[in-house]
Swiss-Prot record:
The gene is tgpA. Displays transglutaminase activity (TGase) in vitro. Plays a critical role in the viability of P.aeruginosa. Might contribute to an essential function linked to the cell wall. Keywords: Acyltransferase, Cell inner membrane, Cell membrane, Membrane, Transferase, Transmembrane, Transmembrane helix. Its EC number is 2.3.2.13. Disruption phenotype: Disruption experiments show that tgpA is essential. Unlike Guinea pig TGase, TGase activity is not affected by EDTA addition, suggesting that TGase activity is Ca(2+)-independent, similar to members of the bacterial transglutaminase family. This is Protein-glutamine gamma-glutamyltransferase. InterPro entries: Bact_TGase-like (IPR052901), Papain-like_cys_pep_sf (IPR038765), TgpA-like_C (IPR025403), TgpA_N (IPR021878), Transglutaminase-like (IPR002931).
Length: 668
């Protein structure tokens, strides 16, 4: 009685394949080899051609699995190593499984492994796929409660699917109303190792490397009209330190006392879904305020969280691009934004002196420097020539080829040398409009650098020297600015972004991205603050008491509707036998046996038994039970049970062969 039924074993094997398959994307290949070996062993045990492993064999297998995790991950702790250990235990449990209790443990391990998979991929496609292993695991769970003589797996699968559909209303209620509790602890996500994106320091060629990447940085949806593309400068961080080669971020502080700015111009409101970056800063237009309680506006006007962004983050922002930022600055900030190395780049310093002597007003000097970039033969490229120790000199006077970081770094250097406080801002510019969802896609190749310089009474002013060399980069995007450049998206040769010239393929790409965006915005982003806003909007807010009453009422309503669906009280009980008879006739009609007008039930059953001799006992049992119930005293077997037995006994596939009466005969 405690043996594992064949149907349950079949679905356990199928479920293991479906559970393990998505994990193989980030797990060592020996996991797949381990499953193949253990599955073959378990099948041989079921066929009584092999025995269960002994204690020393199980110990050896466990030690080998642990050694494999250590060699492939370098540790036995942490989320990455723990996931591999979980899958290894899930596989090894299959071999030692003897009783139904062991099988239950395996099923619950499978459900847990499905949930762990969301830590590595929580996209829409992964969520859709997870329905397959969950259904198979539920079928295995149902199979464990069935008779050992049940041999067909498909009815069990249909029952599992039906149970999942019945659970949908309760799932939706819990999703909408169950309080979101914060985690007790957090771990860095292993999937974010080697994330492509901006870093806290910048050499001239660093941002150019991002032009080779097609990875997504974030998505943005505006309330109202979309601003012009040339106004979309997404600030990430500000770089104020320069060592002669690299620009780097200086220490920043936050707080109302540290920020001096005034709102001016129209307010822009928008939502951002940011991809994991493993960095603490958020992307926003100037000057930004957000609804994130753990995020602050820093003294250089960039948004920063307390913790790095290790998973997709949804946040709302209000920005004032025309705001006045620091009409006066303290001496420390001024000194930091005038700082230059003592030596190096003499020609750039001489150019700064020349411009300062020719232009008394700082804005005139800035305009003259921009005009120099515009009129002289500078080139915009992802693969500029290498420069020496005096990189600014080499770029301005020799190579004259570079990416946005070259132009921003060189301009900030010259402005500082001319006595104008200046700094480099790193972030993203522009974005691709997805008309299917009316939102912007900002990719890593949209990474950009520009310059801010400070003027009394006017505060920090933004200027982009790249616009003077390649205006199409700002107005149309990087693809238009680098048409024909082999380095563009060089790290993504198969990216659909390379084929935006094919309308049908581009439309498919945007439609799929819109589906993913909706999943992330309305499902993954439905957390504490978003849930509170939803409840406030539709229910005027819910305290714990009202929430409990609402959930209780919803649960009672769901159970009542489910009971109505299952019991169908509107169908009269007196007509039950007629419905069973009609089901019996439809079942045989599916196999080519239609009841003739005026043909009695017993004659119909005898004819069906001749055509389907293998199912003759089941047919006779139903006819006998039906006649006893209809014409006897109701003490015989339930014909409904006999009908289900007949349905299980009928063959899956039949081939028609001619008979003497010409009606045809079905053979398995």
């Amino acid at each position: 009685m405690n043996a594992i039924p064949r149907v349950a074993l079949v679905w356990l094997l199928v479920a293991q394949v479906l559970v393990i398959l998505p994990h193989l994307a980030y797990m060592p290949l020996w996991i797949a080899a381990m499953w193949l070996g253990c599955a073959a062993w378990r099948v041989q045990v079921f066929r009584m051609r092999a025995g269960y492993p002994r204690a020393w064999v199980k110990l050896a297998l466990a030690l080998l699995a642990g050694a494999g995790v250590w060699l492939s991950r370098g540790s036995l702790v942490g989320l990455d190593a723990g996931a591999v250990l979980l899958i290894a235990a899930f596989i090894l449990k299959l071999v030692e499984m003897k009783t139904r209790r062991d099988a239950l443990v395996l099923v619950f391990l499978g459900f847990f492994a499905v949930v762990v998979g969301y830590l590595f991929d929580d996209g829409f496609l992964a969520a859709l796929y997870s329905l397959l292993p969950v259904t198979a695991l539920l079928a295995a769970l149902i199979g464990l409660q069935q008779s050992a003589f049940a041999s067909r797996p498909w009815p069990t699968l249909r029952l599992a699917g039906g149970l999942l559909l019945q659970a949908l209303p309760l799932m939706l209620l819990l999703f909408l109303f169950f309080p979101r509790l914060g985690p007790l602890w957090s771990l860095p996500m292993p999937g974010n190792k080697g994330v492509t994106g901006l870093s806290e320091s910048m050499a001239p060629g660093d941002i150019a490397e991002l032009g080779r990447s097609a990875e997504l940085a974030f998505r943005v949806r505006f309330e109202g009209a979309l601003p012009p593309r040339e106004q979309l400068y997404w600030r990430a961080l500000t770089m104020e330190r320069f060592d002669g080669r690299r620009w780097a971020q200086a220490p920043q502080w936050s707080g109302e006392d540290a920020l001096h700015w005034q709102k001016r111009g129209p307010e822009l409101r928008y939502d951002v879904i940011m991809q994991p970056s493993s960095q603490p800063w958020l992307f926003a237009l100037d000057v930004a305020q957000t609804d994130q309680t753990d995020t602050r506006l820093m003294s250089d006007f960039h948004l920063q969280r307390r913790q790095p962004v290790e998973q997709r983050l949804f946040y709302r922002v209000s920005s004032w691009p025309q705001a006045l930022r620091e009409s006066s600055i303290d001496p420390r900030t001024r000194w930091r934004n005038l700082q230059l190395p003592m030596h190096g780049n003499p020609r750039a310093r001489a150019l700064a002196d020349e411009l300062r002597q020719a232009h008394a007003q700082p804005q005139a000097l800035v305009a003259a420097l921009l005009q120099r970039f515009n009129h002289e033969p500078f080139a915009y490229t992802l693969k500029p020539p290498a420069t020496g120790a005096d990189g600014v000199d080499d770029f301005l006077f020799d190579t004259r080829s570079g990416f946005c970081a070259h132009y921003a770094g060189a301009m900030a250097f010259v402005l500082r040398a001319a006595g104008i406080p200046a700094r480099v801002v790193a972030g993203y510019q522009g974005g691709e409009l997805n008309p299917a969802g009316n939102y912007l896609l900002v990719h890593q190749f949209d990474a950009h650098a520009w310059v801010e310089y400070w003027q009394p009474e006017q505060g920090w002013l933004s200027v982009d020297p790249t616009y003077q060399v390649a205006p199409e980069r700002i107005e149309q995007g990087l693809e238009q600015a680098l048409a024909g450049d082999s380095e563009y998206l060089a790290d993504a040769p198969l990216s659909p972004l390379r084929y935006r010239g094919l309308p049908w393929l581009n439309d498919m790409r945007l439609a799929w991205d819109s589906l993913n965006y909706g999943w992330q915005r309305w499902v993954l982003a439905y957390q504490g603050e978003q849930q509170g806003a939803f409840l406030q909007r539709w229910f005027g807010g819910l305290d714990p008491t009202r929430l409990g009453l609402l959930l209780g009422a919803a649960a009672i309503l769901s159970v009542g509707l489910l009971a109505l669906f299952l019991l169908k009280p509107w169908q009269g009980r007196g007509d039950l036998r007629s419905r069973q008879l009609r089901r019996f006739e439809r079942l045989l009609e599916m196999h080519g046996l239609r009841r003739s007008p005026g043909e009695g039930l017993r004659s119909y059953g005898e004819r069906a038994a001749r055509v389907l001799p293998a199912q003759a006992p089941a047919i006779a049992a139903f006819v006998g039970a039906f006649e006893a119930q209809r014409y006897g005293h109701g003490g015989a077997d339930d014909p409904g049970l006999r009908l289900r037995a007949l349905r299980r006994a009928l063959p899956w596939r039949l081939v028609r062969t001619p008979t003497r009466d010409g009606r045809g005969e079905e053979q398995a």
